[in-house]
Amino acid sequence: MTGSDQTRAKLIDIELDESIGRSTPDVEHERAVAIFDLIEENSFQPVNDSGAGPYRLKLSLAEQRLVFAVAREDGTAVVTHILSLTPLRRIVKDYYMICESYYDAIRSSTPSHIEAIDMGRRGLHNEGSQTLMDRLSGKIDIDFDTARRLFTLVCVLHWRG
């Protein structure tokens, strides 16, 4: 991919389904950071898209499925992928539980305890990110860092829903 192609194969806007509602301040902070980081640096290319990016992404949940609605910069629809949440459900649940422990720990635990929880949290996050990459394989090409940030947003949607 040339330098010009790389700057076009990216997301410039992320929208989460706001109809689900808001979550805890900690979760909302994770959402805001993930969106900011994702917009700043990402690699995102719908497979077989004959047009060019950059792209806008709307993430939502519909009937216990994860919906990736991809559009061009001008809002023209490119593709919508609907993925089952089943492969991610256990990881998201475990990740949510360990995040709650982490948020509790940063308020009252020792640095070594916080570090131990954070290592587990990062491991689960990596597992979820890889699962998401696998689920998007053949649909949307993303790199691992993009998958990590998208996994955070999937978790936020799931926690709200």
From Swiss-Prot:
Superkingdom, natural source: Bacteria
Pfam families: UPF0262
HAMAP family, alphabetized: UPF0262
Similarity-based family: Belongs to the UPF0262 family.
Protein name in the entry: UPF0262 protein mll6455
Taxonomic source organism: Mesorhizobium japonicum (strain LMG 29417 / CECT 9101 / MAFF 303099)
